[in-house]
Each structure stands twice: as C-alpha cells, then as structure tokens.
Amino acid sequence: MIVLGIDPGSRRCGYGVVAREGARLTVVESGVLVPGDLPMAQRLGRILEGLDALIARARPVEASVESVFSGASPRSALVLGQARGVALAAAARAGLPVFEYAPSEVKLAFTGNGRAGKDQMLRTARMLLGAAPDLSDEADALAIAVCHLARRAFAVPAAGAGRAAAARAAAARLRPSRRDHRGTP
C-alpha cells in the first residue's frame, strides 16, 4: 500500500509518499514544495499543481493530512486552513480517501512521544525510514504517512461517500466480544 502524507503550509508544503509491504516501510518520494515569494493565491496554485503532479507520479491509494493546529495566532490558523484546503482538494480530485490526524497523534505514532520536537522527528525519519529530510516539513509529512499506515485499521476518512461505512467497520473492530467481563454470554 502506498500512502501520501502532507504537512500543509502556504510557504512550505511538506510531502512524503511511503509504501508498506508487510512490516517493511519504504520512502517512495519526499520533499517540500516551496512556491516562492508570491501573492497567496498564486502560492496556493503552485502547491496544488505540485501535489497534482506528485499524485500522478507516485500513485498513492490514500492520503493523510495533519489537522489544523491553531497555535497563538488566528491569522496563522486561517492561512494554514487555506493550505490544507488545497491539499484536501488535490487528494479529492485524484479520488483518494483522505484521513486527518492531530499533530500530537502523529508525533506519538512516529516517535513514541506526543510532544516530540523537530530534531526528534528528523532523527526518527532517518532511523526508521533511512530518509534524510532537509527540513522538518518533509519529516513531518513522512511521519503523517507512517502514522496513517500504523493507524489504518481503525482510520475513518475525513469525508466522502465511504465515511459512514468505514466508521461502522472501525467501530465493529473496537466492540468487545459478546461475553461480558465475567465470561458469560
């Protein structure tokens, strides 16, 4: 299975495509889209073009995106939301189911520490995947893809026609057996 992880941003958009065969993880492609010092609409357009080309080239079957972290500035959250919208649109245009994960969930799945810093994320990308990301955006995108692969059995798409069915299937996997805690039916 090949998964695309996206760390959205309007100045730098990290991407990581990771393939899993059995227990083995392989980086198919990773990097950072840097649209340059352009007006916002043009930067978002360049990111969309870059993601479209990446999806056509790498052919992932699912996409995963980091959910919005508002931080200290409402303006930053709005700008991040615009970049996320572009990432979601690129995946939707390609017909990919999209899954979202909180930053702390990604860090926990990738490093074992939900509050991991940039250095720890970069080190884990090198150790776990043999990747050598130059920027934390790239390492974060790889981590998002790995998080999705690790959580996939219980993941529910963020939107789309399959969301309700996937949610029911995931809930069924979480249900306890027909026996109660005393072992009686």
From Swiss-Prot:
Cofactor(s) required, per the database record: Mg(2+)
Record-level GO BP terms: DNA recombination; DNA repair
Keyword set includes Secreted: no
One GO cellular component, as annotated: Holliday junction resolvase complex
Main location group: cytoplasm
Enzyme Commission (EC) number: 3.1.21.10
Annotated keywords: Cytoplasm, DNA damage, DNA recombination, DNA repair, DNA-binding, Endonuclease, Hydrolase, Magnesium, Metal-binding, Nuclease
Annotated catalytic residues: 7, 66, 137
Annotated positions binding Mg(2+) 1: 7, 137
Catalytic activity: Endonucleolytic cleavage at a junction such as a reciprocal single-stranded crossover between two homologous DNA duplexes (Holliday junction)
Compartment(s): Cytoplasm
Matching Gene3D superfamilies: Ribonuclease H-like superfamily/Ribonuclease H
Binding site residues for Mg(2+) 2: 66
Entries under Pfam families matching the protein: RuvC
Molecular function (Gene Ontology), one example: magnesium ion binding
Source superkingdom: Bacteria
NCBIfam families, sorted: ruvC
Function: The RuvA-RuvB-RuvC complex processes Holliday junction (HJ) DNA during genetic recombination and DNA repair. Endonuclease that resolves HJ intermediates. Cleaves cruciform DNA by making single-stranded nicks across the HJ at symmetrical positions within the homologous arms, yielding a 5'-phosphate and a 3'-hydroxyl group; requires a central core of homology in the junction. The consensus cleavage sequence is 5'-(A/T)TT(C/G)-3'. Cleavage occurs on the 3'-side of the TT dinucleotide at the point of strand exchange.
Protein family per UniProt: Belongs to the RuvC family.
Assembly: Homodimer which binds Holliday junction (HJ) DNA. The HJ becomes 2-fold symmetrical on binding to RuvC with unstacked arms; it has a different conformation from HJ DNA in complex with RuvA. In the full resolvosome a probable DNA-RuvA(4)-RuvB(12)-RuvC(2) complex forms which resolves the HJ.
Protein's name according to its UniProt entry: Crossover junction endodeoxyribonuclease RuvC
Source organism: Anaeromyxobacter sp. (strain K)
Source lineage: Bacteria, Pseudomonadati, Myxococcota, Myxococcia, Myxococcales
Gene name linked to the record: ruvC
